[in-house]
A protein has these predicted regions:
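Conserved loop->alpha-helix
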Residues: 1-186
Length: 186
């Protein structure tokens, strides 16, 4: 996650996002993840870029719930020469979860997220999960939810600073877990 942008405009099939860092070397057709959803920059200016949103993207992600002024997490595609500071996040959202509770534990913020049953099997304690494109570690897994402990730096430098109980968030399960499942099913 490189920066927090602001949704400037929404249309029936796309949106425009205000940004700066992710636009430093952008070219038409480049991938920019918005809340963990890999999207294609179809136009850009010095301070904003536009993307198209397919019906599948609208069904599978929480992007359809955004409004003008919404804060969104932004990240360019990883280069082979970059450091990987988390786990592999592809920008291929598996589904959405819903924020069930937000509590504090000393300096950390504890989020409980309801997860769709079909995704819960990929979630393991101390394993990875991408929430709105943020690589995070699962603290605890329940029958239909999981918890995350978010440090102040992460909350203040992502859209988690604006998340409320009931909000939908994009979830991407660990790709390695999905590959293992696919291999075992053969």
């Amino acid at each position: 996650m490189e920066e927090v942008g602001v949704v400037a405009k929404i249309s029936d099939n796309g949106m425009t996002v205000q940004a700066s860092k992710v636009l430093e070397d952008v070219k038409l057709g480049d991938s920019i993840a918005v809340n963990g959803t890999c999207l294609t920059a179809v136009s850009f200016t010095k301070g904003e870029f536009s993307v198209d949103l397919s019906p599948e993207t609208m069904r599978r992600t929480s992007l359809g719930k955004l409004s003008e002024g919404s804060l969104v997490n932004l990240e360019r595609a990883l280069l082979a020469s970059d450091r990987m500071g988390g786990h592999i996040v592809q920008g291929h959202v598996d589904g959405t979860g819903r924020i069930m509770s937000i509590k504090t534990d000393r300096d950390s913020i504890i989020f409980r997220v309801r997860v769709p049953k079909r995704l819960n099997k990929y979630i393991v304690e101390k394993g990875f999960i991408a929430v709105d494109g943020i690589s995070l570690t699962v603290v605890q897994r329940g029958a239909s939810s999981f918890t995350l402990a978010v440090i102040p730096y992460t909350r203040e430098n992502t859209n988690l600073s604006a998340v409320s109980i009931g909000d939908r968030v994009n979830l991407e399960a660990d790709i390695l877990a999905k590959y293992v499942e696919s291999l075992l099913e053969r």
